[in-house]
Amino acid sequence: MILCDIGNSTAKFYNNGISKVMSIKEFQKFEPKDTVYFINVNPNFKRKLKGTLFFDLAPYFEINTLYSKELGVDRIAASCAINDGIVIDAGSAITVDMVNKNIHMGGFILPGITKYVEAYKSISSVLDVGLNSQVNLDKIPLNTRDAITYGVVNSVVLLVENIAKNRKIYITGGDGQFLSQFFKNAVYDKNLVFRSMLNVIKSKGL
């Protein structure tokens, strides 16, 4: 069974425990040979995904939410994967959602890590130094690379911890593993959205 999570910069595939990431440019040329069960937030693929071998799972997700109807299927899928806690999907954008006793309470959206880095680069080439995954958030930075990393990571961590309180934090997405190390009460699960998709397929008998 092939699953696909189509975002704004990549299309992530999952098949029998094996994950694969495809660029959006590659996905434009992709022609499936078997049925692909997908969720999609990229408006550029609406026509392509009407093909007979593409099966849209979005209509089959059921979520009890206080949020408006604008809630994207990516956030719905991530939120449906947990019963209680905070779920972070760190991709092109970083989505943060709160779930309390299976009720989606709301959430917020931040730029993705790459967007933060690009923003610094656009200000000055001097700030094009990348990030330090070993930065200590408990100490004031003493060099530019650490200063940028501190600003980027803490802008996410402090906002999340402000709403998380003592709730468990679940993190997924391309930058999820990087971010997870900066939270004390976090679980990183790269296949969290795919598990949610599999649950829908099983529960709906698809």
Curated annotation (Swiss-Prot):
SUPFAM superfamilies: Actin-like ATPase domain. It is found in: Cytoplasm. One of its GO terms (cellular component) is cytoplasm. Its cofactor is NH4(+); K(+). The keyword Signal does not apply. The active site is at 74 (proton acceptor). Catalyzes the phosphorylation of pantothenate (Pan), the first step in CoA biosynthesis. Homodimer. This is Type III pantothenate kinase. It comes from Campylobacter hominis (strain ATCC BAA-381 / DSM 21671 / CCUG 45161 / LMG 19568 / NCTC 13146 / CH001A).
